[in-house]
């Protein structure tokens, strides 16, 4: 029989006592009263905070939005089909946050920043709150650098600056997404990080956009956040905030970012669905009372940071869909009042074959020429005035039978200027190409051409200019000014190419 020494026993007991941990873990637990339509009513959870994440037994996560006297209303970030009445719910003590890192570039993620492109996990060491406060007044400065879209109509007449919020608004099928995606394609080589947020769109449309980005090499500097039409309303509501958090990560690291919300009408509809199911009182068009705050707290996160914070920027291009051109509906007026200008796309222009279908008359940028290089200011000043006069004359000319020569000339010039603004999709132009194109139009060099020839002439002319007169692009790029030397080179190129073009057309 083994001798047991009492000292050994006592030392083992002492060791066990030392290792004993008296930690008490307290959980805030509740019980599901009712679940359905993406909403759960929970009894208990007495100390839960508004916006806190709650975890259900099956692993589904929800957000506590309604804190009522006898229950908590939570929205689910999933279908919630396996949650049962009477099951327990745990408060996590956290609010929604996402991992962030440079590795997100080139990836497609959902509203919880989880990859959905089948390319594996995304490494990330930092995280950011989905709902971060916007920069304050002292943290900002006014926008002064141009954010080129590559579209002549916008860059010349409705210029966008880095840190600006410019609304893209129009009916369905007027080319809103095309304007937004072309802007992303034009950021190639500009050192701008782009975030494209697709909210409630068809999965096929999102796939098409991602395909375009991949073909044109734009995915290298772009993150796509997608919640398609079959996603729960909660995730469609969160997607824009996730996109903003990813863009902010780069903005606070002294980089320039561009974020596109496509589109905020669908986010508002998802939020309306959640609010009505939570039994919040409906307001105008059945939207809840805080739908303005929904968009204002999102769009206020776009900013041009002060020099103390590194001068990073976040430019936001929110998209809003109108019904039959009604800009005075609830969501359009809300977003117009929050943003620094709007680019209005009209169905009439689109149907008339003017693409991009931008209605220059009612589109505006509140940053204005501060967001243009000097060369663009020099040539584009005349363009908006001439187009406005043309629109007025055109309306008048429909009723007048005999017009004097000056009026006929002005109408002819206006029609050619309108042709000059037409562009193919996914073919953004550099600023020097735009300057050359506008100069050709406003100085009457295209007046000798037939209207049908103008677009072809300009496409060939831009190629001719790049190939034969590289000095012109050098001057504009280096000095940002349309100098006398640049004008001489451009005039030469126009005359040479016009001669060639007319000879070709005669054959």
Swiss-Prot record:
A matching Pfam family: ATP-synt_ab_N
Binding, ATP: 170-177
Database matches in InterPro entries: ATP_synth_asu-like_sf, ATP_synth_asu_C, ATP_synth_asu_C_sf, ATP_synth_F1_a_nt-bd_dom, ATP_synth_F1_asu, ATPase_a/bsu_AS, ATPase_F1/V1/A1_a/bsu_N, ATPase_F1/V1/A1_a/bsu_N_sf
Catalytic EC class: translocase
Subcellular location: Plastid, Chloroplast thylakoid membrane
Family: Belongs to the ATPase alpha/beta chains family.
Name of the protein in question: ATP synthase subunit alpha, chloroplastic
Gene name as annotated: atpA
């Amino acid at each position: 029989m083994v001798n047991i020494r009492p000292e050994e026993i006592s030392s083992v007991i002492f060791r066990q006592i030392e290792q004993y941990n008296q930690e008490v873990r307290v959980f805030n637990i509740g019980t599901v009263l009712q679940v359905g339509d993406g909403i759960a009513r929970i009894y208990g959870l007495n100390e839960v905070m508004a916006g806190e994440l709650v975890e259900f037994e099956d692993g589904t996560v929800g957000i506590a939005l309604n804190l009522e006297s006898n229950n908590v209303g939570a929205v689910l970030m999933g279908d919630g089909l396996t949650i049962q009445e009477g099951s327990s719910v745990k408060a996590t003590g956290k609010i929604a946050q996402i991992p962030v890192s440079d590795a997100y570039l080139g990836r497609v993620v959902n509203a919880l920043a989880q990859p959905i492109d089948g390319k594996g996990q995304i490494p990330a060491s930092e995280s950011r709150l989905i709902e971060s406060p916007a920069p304050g007044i002292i943290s900002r400065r006014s926008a002064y650098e141009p954010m080129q879209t590559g579209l002549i109509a916008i860059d010349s007449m409705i210029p966008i600056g880095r840190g600006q919020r410019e609304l893209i608004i129009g009916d369905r099928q007027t080319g809103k997404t095309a304007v937004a995606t072309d802007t992303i394609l034009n950021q190639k080589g500009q050192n701008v990080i782009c975030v494209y947020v697709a909210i409630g769109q068809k999965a096929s449309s999102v796939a098409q956009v991602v395909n375009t980005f991949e073909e044109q090499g734009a995915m290298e500097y772009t993150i796509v956040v997608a919640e398609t039409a079959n996603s729960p309303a909660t995730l469609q509501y969160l997607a824009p905030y996730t996109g903003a958090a990813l863009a902010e990560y780069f903005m606070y690291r002294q980089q320039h970012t561009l974020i596109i919300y496509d589109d905020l009408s669908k986010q508002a509809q998802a939020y309306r669905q959640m609010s009505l199911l939570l039994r919040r009182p409906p307001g105008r068009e059945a939207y809840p009372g805080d739908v303005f705050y929904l968009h204002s707290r999102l769009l206020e996160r776009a900013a041009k940071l002060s020099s103390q914070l590194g001068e990073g920027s976040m430019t936001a291009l929110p998209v809003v869909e109108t019904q039959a051109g009604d800009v005075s509906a609830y969501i359009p007026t809300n977003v117009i009042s929050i943003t620094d200008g709007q680019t209005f796309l009209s169905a009439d222009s689109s149907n008339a074959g003017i693409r991009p279908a931008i209605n220059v008359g009612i589109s505006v940028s509140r940053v204005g020429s501060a967001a243009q290089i000097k060369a663009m200011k020099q040539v584009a000043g005349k363009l908006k005035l001439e187009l406005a006069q043309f629109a007025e004359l055109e309306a008048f000319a429909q009723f007048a039978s005999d017009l004097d020569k000056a009026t006929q000339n002005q109408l002819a010039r206006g029609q050619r200027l309108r042709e000059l603004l037409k562009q193919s999709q996914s073919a953004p132009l550099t600023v020097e190409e735009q300057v050359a194109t506008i100069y050709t139009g406003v100085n009457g060099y295209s007046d000798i051409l037939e209207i049908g020839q103008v677009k072809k002439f300009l496409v060939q002319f831009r190629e001719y200019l790049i190939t034969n007169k590289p000095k012109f692009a050098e001057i504009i790029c280096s000095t940002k000014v349309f100098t006398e030397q640049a004008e001489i080179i451009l005039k030469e190129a126009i005359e040479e190419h016009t001669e060639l073009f007319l000879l070709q057309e005669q054959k």
